[in-house]
């Protein structure tokens, strides 16, 4: 028999080659769907289960892909033990395990079995993958490695075989039906052969005698997970965020200062000239401005000199600017580990005195001399050594807290926040961003909650990469 299965998860692993015993590396399974077919391809059993996330939550970016929210999974999900038991009962009947990019799904279920203390159940099964060089050469989609054709996604393979799309891609239930249909079609059309699996001839003969053209759909109904999740959404993501009017006394009393600015010294990332940054700061009557270039402080001297020249001008004596020197560093797990790519989280450091400035220089240098791997990096051990005299901002959506909210989970984001506060105490701040992106509202709601629960101050920052609205196009060209 053939068991064809697919999973939906909380995200992707950091290390694709990590063992399944590395539970922190492998994301959690939140939907498991499978079909059991007999040796002639007839559908024997079909199942699709949401899994109740008892000890984790489903991050926003993952929900955007498959539509399964934490609320939906808690409402309709079964316990992991129950789902695994149902799956293993059918798995025991199978000789062949089939999937699209099936190694990932095997690792996901293998990691869940490990968490439950159950030994791997896949060792005795013959694995058949519909995402290989064989299907790559069938679809002939350019863009693969070393000039080869790229491995097709399930959508691309399905479209090539049947000249049609399938509804609800990334719903494991729909993906399994599409994978099943694709698998039996490439058997029927002799894309696979006897060398690919032992019982090919029997299945091939049956399919050819019963399907004169393409393999048909199985007529299964699939729940629209995105619609179901949307029904459970709160009325407004803004209901807990108080927006003050521009003439509010609080705003007038506390003038805004830009604390997260990149300049042209953030190579290929920003079009801002330091002279224009200082000029615009003065134009808006801001009392201070920060320079926080990416992983380097080459612009610090030019920045300080530009501000000093402005302040030394007699006509500016009543409108002096305070220069704040900082840097945006990449904080990874282990800056000495170059066995896999880990760019880390982009974190903003500001020097509040000379000691902080010197420590920031040291950390910045170590990122290049010791930690460079794709990008300059340091780790939290380095931060603990050189934290004195520094202020830390949580960063934008690429900072650790915000990134974990979007891609890992609320609990993990909160644990990371606790670490930063334990080191920097009152010199740690949470950045509220409003870039007009949907993600901002998701992040801001939780940051406000974290701020209240952990007594951490919020600051308003938008990541500045160009000075004027007219420079936006030039910045886009730079990134391309």
List the model feature ranges, each with a label.
Residues 1, 31-33, 346:
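Conserved beta-strand and immediately adjacent loop positions that scaffold enzyme active sites
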Residues 1-3, 255:
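Extreme N-terminal starter segment of soluble prokaryotic enzymes
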Residues 7-15, 20, 264, 467-468:
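Short acidic, Gly/Ser-rich segments with clustered Asp/Glu that frequently serve as metal-coordination loops
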Residues 15, 25-70, 88-213:
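Metal-dependent phosphoesterase core characteristic of DEDDh/y 3'-5' exonuclease domains
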Residues 21-26, 339:
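Short consensus segments that form the blades of beta-propeller domains
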Residues 67-78, 144-145, 259-272:
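Glycine-rich phosphate-binding "P-loop"
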Residues 75-85, 409-415:
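Glycine-rich, highly charged phosphate/nucleotide-binding loops
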Residues 128, 212, 216-480:
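Phosphodiester-processing cores and adjacent nucleic acid-binding clamps
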């Amino acid at each position: 028999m053939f068991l064809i299965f697919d999973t939906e998860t909380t995200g992707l692993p950091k290390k694709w080659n990590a063992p399944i015993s590395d539970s922190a590396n492998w994301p959690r399974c939140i939907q498991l769907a499978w079909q059991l077919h007999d040796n002639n391809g007839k559908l024997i059993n079909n199942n699709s289960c949401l899994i109740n996330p008892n000890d984790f939550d489903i991050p926003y970016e993952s929900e955007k892909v498959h539509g399964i929210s934490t609320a939906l999974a808690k409402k309709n999900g079964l316990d992991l033990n129950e789902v695994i038991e149902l799956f293993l009962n059918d798995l025991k009947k199978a000789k062949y395990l089939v999937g699209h990019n099936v190694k990932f799904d095997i690792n996901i279920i293998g990691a869940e079995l490990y968490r439950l203390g159950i030994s791997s159940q896949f060792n005795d099964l013959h694995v058949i993958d519909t995402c290989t060089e064989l299907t790559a050469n069938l679809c002939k989609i350019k863009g693969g490695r070393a000039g080869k054709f790229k491995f097709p996604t399930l959508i691309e393979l399905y479209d090539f075989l049947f000249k049609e799309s399938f509804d609800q891609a990334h719903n494991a239930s729909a993906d399994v039906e599409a994978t099943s249909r694709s698998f039996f079609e490439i058997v029927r059309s002799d894309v696979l052969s006897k060398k690919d699996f032992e019982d090919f001839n029997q299945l091939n003969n049956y399919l050819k005698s019963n399907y004169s053209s393409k393999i048909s759909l199985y007529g299964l109904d699939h729940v629209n997970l995105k619609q179901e999740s949307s029904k459970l959404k709160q009325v407004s993501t803004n209901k807990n965020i108080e927006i003050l009017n521009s003439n509010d006394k609080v705003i007038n009393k506390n003038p805004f200062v830009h604390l997260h600015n990149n300049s042209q010294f953030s190579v290929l990332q920003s079009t801002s000239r330091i002279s224009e940054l200082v000029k615009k700061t003065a134009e808006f009557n801001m009392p201070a401005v920060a320079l926080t270039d990416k992983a380097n402080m080459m612009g610090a001297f030019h920045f300080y000199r530009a501000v000093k020249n402005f302040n030394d001008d007699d006509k500016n004596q009543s409108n002096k600017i305070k220069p704040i020197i900082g840097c945006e560093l990449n904080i990874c797990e282990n800056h000495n580990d170059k066995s896999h790519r880990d760019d880390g989280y982009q974190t903003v450091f500001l020097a509040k005195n000379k000691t902080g400035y010197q420590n920031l220089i040291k950390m910045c240098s170590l990122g290049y001399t010791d930690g460079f791997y794709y990008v300059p990096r340091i780790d939290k051990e380095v931060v603990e050594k050189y934290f004195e005299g520094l202020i830390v901002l949580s960063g934008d959506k690429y900072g650790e807290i915000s990134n974990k909210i979007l891609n890992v989970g609320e609990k993990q984001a909160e644990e990371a926040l606790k670490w930063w506060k334990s080191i920097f105490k009152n010199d740690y701040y949470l950045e509220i961003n409003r870039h007009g992106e949907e993600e901002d509202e998701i992040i801001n709601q939780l940051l406000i909650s974290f701020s209240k629960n952990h007594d951490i101050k919020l600051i308003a920052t938008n990541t500045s990469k160009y000075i004027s609205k007219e420079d936006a196009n030039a910045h886009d060209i730079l990134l391309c």
